[in-house]
Curated annotation (Swiss-Prot):
Superkingdom, natural source: Bacteria
Gene Ontology terms: biological process: cellular response to oxidative stress
Organismal lineage: Bacteria, Pseudomonadati, Pseudomonadota, Gammaproteobacteria, Lysobacterales
Primary role: Could be a mediator in iron transactions between iron acquisition and iron-requiring processes, such as synthesis and/or repair of Fe-S clusters in biosynthetic enzymes.
PANTHER family documented for this protein: FE(2+)-TRAFFICKING PROTEIN-RELATED (PTHR36965:SF1)
Protein name according to UniProt: Probable Fe(2+)-trafficking protein
Keyword Magnesium: no
Length: 90
């Protein structure tokens, strides 16, 4: 049975995640407030950040940066694209 939540990212009722996707309190907040579409959008944005900025998830400072961007992207809608990033043609 699907779980319906009000998604803070999409600003509408939508299908919630099936599991807590991130550790700690932030993971619980994401599980409670972010839907599947919002989480998929974050994963795509995170991949772009890792690739464009040459980040390593093993580096603690890079992980801290990604967590900060996760908060901005999902809850503040203010995450920026990397400097010099050009959107691919659709």
């Amino acid at each position: 049975m699907q779980r319906i939540i009000f998604c803070e990212y999409e600003k509408r009722d939508t299908e919630g995640l099936d599991f807590v996707p991130y550790p700690g309190e932030l993971g619980q907040k994401i599980f409670a407030c972010i839907g599947k579409v919002g989480w998929a959008a974050w994963l795509a944005h995170q991949t772009m950040l890792i690739n464009e900025n040459r980040l390593s998830p093993r580096n603690p400072s890079h992980r801290a940066f990604l967590e900060e961007e996760l908060n901005k992207f999902l809850f503040e809608r203010s995450a920026a694209k990397p400097e010099g990033y050009i959107e691919p043609d659709a």
